[in-house]
């Protein structure tokens, strides 16, 4: 975070096959660095501001590039995991005949997508494998940890034997894991994420060593 004043950047008119548009370049920031900006323009003779409220700004966060070979499987498996998790919860409520298989499939997808590929994405993007508990306060990592532990608990309750009769306790455990997962997914993905401490950078510090992890 910094108290620096806004720096004006003049937008340029760019014409292409798709039409004419205004473009302006924002200065690139180190990984986890953030910029706030707003746009002022004159449209039909009237001054306009975007966003309209004077105390509101657009916030963007920068990251280092993540290889598609890591990012795409991570995103795909996390989407599949939440779909399987929701299906597991419905199965626990109404038709638990395949609840165990669905719960274990959810845990497997979350293990590979979230606990293995997730830290790899974090390492490429922000330079650290894990910035959640107990190493830091990154909300995204902590959400992943809560979801993972919820499904580990649910699967430990229902067990591996597909022939073993489903119990009320097992159904409650699976449904609870679904609720925990749903609540975690409702929290915005980047909330409480890695944040660059510009005060350290201004003192000449290495930007990769000046990344906070959500505790502040």
Predicted feature locations:
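C-terminal ends of transmembrane alpha-helices
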Residues: 46-65, 112-127, 182-199
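Conserved, compact domain cores that house catalytic/ligand-binding motifs in diverse enzymes
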Residues: 64-136, 142
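Glycan-association/targeting regions that enable binding to alpha-glucans and other polysaccharides
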Residues: 1-80, 85-97, 162-163, 167-178, ...
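Generic detector of multi-pass transmembrane helix bundles and their immediately adjacent loops
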Residues: 128-131, 135, 140-216
